[in-house]
Amino acid sequence: MSFSVVILAAGQGTRMKSSLPKVLHTICGRPMIWHIIKEAQKISDDITVILYHQAEIIKEYIQKEFDGIRFVLQDHKNYPGTGGALRNIYFSNEKILVLNGDMPLIQAKTLKNFISIDADIVLSVIRMEDPCGYGRVIIKNDEVEYIVEQKDANEEELAVCNVNAGVYLFKKNLLEQFLPKLTNDNAQKEYYLTDIIALAKQHGFSIKPIFVPKNEFQGVNSKYDLANAEIVMQDRIKRHWMQQGVIMRLPQTIYIEVDVQFQGECELENGVVLRGKTLIENSHIKAHSVVENSTIRYSTIGPFARIRPQSMIQESHIGNFVEVKKSSLNGVKAGHLSYLGDATIDEGTNIGAGTITCNYDGKAKYQTIIGKNVFVGSDTQLIAPVKIEDDVLIAAGTTVTKDIPKGALAISRTPLKIVKDFYYKFFGKN
């Protein structure tokens, strides 16, 4: 049977204490809503997102990343709350899976289990060791009898450890029957989706529980929750890649975003940070190095190196305290203390310590092109735009301001002046 997915993302998220919409806060490089839609698309091609607070900002982001997502603006003035969120939706399929926009850890393989259960309502349940503060889900004979808030529970009900995880599968006819009957007769004056449980039970509908893992169904309501969710996702990402053969030294100190990919045999040392759409192929990333939106192939990076976006590094050694930005390096050695930005450097070239590509004049960025088998001496400044042909030797301390032809030596130094006995005269010593 086909089914629809509805994602509730209309909430204000005041506990996040941020001007950014809650569902756009990132986990492992992507907003929470991205993770949820990505998993939902694995099980359904009919996805609707319910919006209200900062709706246009959220909608704009989703439309940029995904095709075919429908949007409904909640009538929050007249129908606030989770029950009000579903009032104006046309359901095209016979089953509707309702997800929350602040549950980025949910996985498609778990959601598929909802569909396999034959019931009018499938209610997600978490078994908690300490359910204090949560309403309890009372189950008898494999059926949900009712949900009771902690303040209303008796001693027997308080002993129950089952709590509502907040994800539901409804049959279409049930929603059409009971959504109009919801009332806002409560302290918050909101329409609650959970009230449908009691209405359905009164009319003899079947309500089945599905026990789900807590670490997938934890909501993110604060920056603390956000940090905890990222820890869980980091563990998933690193576990996956280690199972694929990536070596990670002290993996708890390594940070890998969700779009990072590995090929071949790779090793990451402690403190490595990999961000964005980065590809690491048959390479060794040494301690405390950062790679962002770049490709590293058959290379050694670090320790303490920074590879900034749009860099392509192949068969190269990038050493400690070297920064590379928007550059292509093929067969290059840059051992230490250099900045290589907007540069193309070919094989066999050695970059000495303290080399700087001066790529910005205050108004625009310019290219530095270095050919094959070039030796760049320490403390060299390359004033872009500039082109260095093959087989060039650049002496230490040189400032290169014009193109250098093949096979040449480039040197620019102030002559060394030695003043004898100056130390003694300056300090007044004999």
UniProtKB/Swiss-Prot annotation:
Compartment list: Cytoplasm
Catalytic residues (UniProt): 336
Gene Ontology CC, one term: membrane
Alphabetical list of PROSITE patterns matching this protein: HEXAPEP_TRANSFERASES
Annotated residues for binding of acetyl-CoA: 353, 359-360, 378, 396, 413
Span list, region N-acetyltransferase: 245-430
Renumbered residue ranges of the record's region Pyrophosphorylase: 1-223
Parts forming coiled coils: none
Ranges for region Linker: 224-244
GO molecular function, one term: glucosamine-1-phosphate N-acetyltransferase activity
Protein family according to the UniProt entry: In the N-terminal section; belongs to the N-acetylglucosamine-1-phosphate uridyltransferase family. In the C-terminal section; belongs to the transferase hexapeptide repeat family.
HAMAP family named among the record's database cross-references: GlmU
Name this protein carries in UniProt: Bifunctional protein GlmU
Gene: glmU
